[in-house]
């Protein structure tokens, strides 16, 4: 199928990006999903610093590539081997899909899946290869197996988390990275326990969710630190939100 997407073809554009326009909106061709893949109509896509790191070249990825890994959408087509999803399901995307078979997955560390990391670094899905082509038939890479800065995207079953339809999809998109990364850093990496004292440095999207993750974990004292003048509204959110 054909749709539009934000394609990055070169890195190192000058800032501000609003003027240099490093992304081009192009018509792309999506191949049908494989047996363990789904086709999703994109509802929301956040701009994460990881996207900016690909644009400025500090996070090397094969080019060209369709960016976007923090998003949400509605499933419109399901691969033949998938039995636990249905068309019309609302979903949030996770950029850390797991194969369930590699050493890291078997050790209980699916978020560090070796297969997903290897294929993602090559701009491919876990089933191998890309499902994206440009108007001339040339291959375009996937970003973290997601590429949600587009009207539609094909991704692995492991990248899909079904959410209740009562949750607005535009809001749910943030769970795909900012919420998962911030709360996960506190709960899974730092392993904060009830009564612990926690300091969070920086109150962007990830930091705010780190604070909320610390509260969820039962931290006895939470210290939020940010020197940016624009952070005052974030402090208000933490006080009264």
Map each language-model feature to its residues.
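Cysteine-cluster motifs in flexible loop/terminal segments that predominantly coordinate metals
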Residues: 95-158
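Short Gly/Pro-enriched turn/cap motifs at secondary-structure boundaries
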Residues: 18, 29-31, 62-68, 140-145, ...
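Mid-domain Rossmann-like dinucleotide-binding core that forms the NAD(H)/NADP(H) cofactor-binding site
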Residues: 151-152, 158-241
């Amino acid at each position: 199928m054909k749709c539009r997407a934000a394609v990055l073809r070169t890195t190192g554009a000058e800032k501000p990006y609003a003027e240099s326009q490093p992304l081009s909106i192009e018509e792309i061709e999506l191949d049908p999903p494989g047996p363990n893949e789904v086709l999703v109509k994109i509802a929301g896509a956040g701009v994460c610093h990881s996207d900016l790191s690909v644009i400025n070249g500090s996070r090397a990825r094969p080019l060209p590539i369709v960016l976007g890994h923090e998003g949400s959408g509605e499933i419109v087509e399901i691969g033949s081997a998938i039995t636990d999803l249905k068309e019309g399901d609302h979903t949030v995307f996770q950029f850390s899909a797991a194969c369930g078979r590699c050493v890291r997955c078997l050790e209980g560390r699916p978020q560090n899946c070796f297969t997903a990391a290897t294929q993602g670094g090559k701009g491919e899905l876990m089933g191998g290869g890309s499902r994206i082509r440009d108007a001339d038939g040339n291959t375009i890479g996937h970003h973290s197996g997601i590429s949600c800065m587009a009207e539609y995207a094909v991704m692995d079953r492991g990248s899909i988390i079904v959410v209740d339809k009562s949750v607005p999809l535009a809001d749910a998109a943030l769970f795909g990275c900012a919420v998962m990364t911030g709360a996960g850093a506190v709960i899974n990496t730092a392993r904060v326990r009830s009564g612990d004292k926690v300091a969070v440095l920086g109150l962007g999207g990830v930091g705010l969710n780190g604070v909320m993750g610390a509260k969820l974990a039962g931290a006895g004292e939470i210290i939020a630190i940010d020197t940016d003048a624009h952070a005052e509204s974030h402090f208000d959110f933490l006080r009264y939100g």
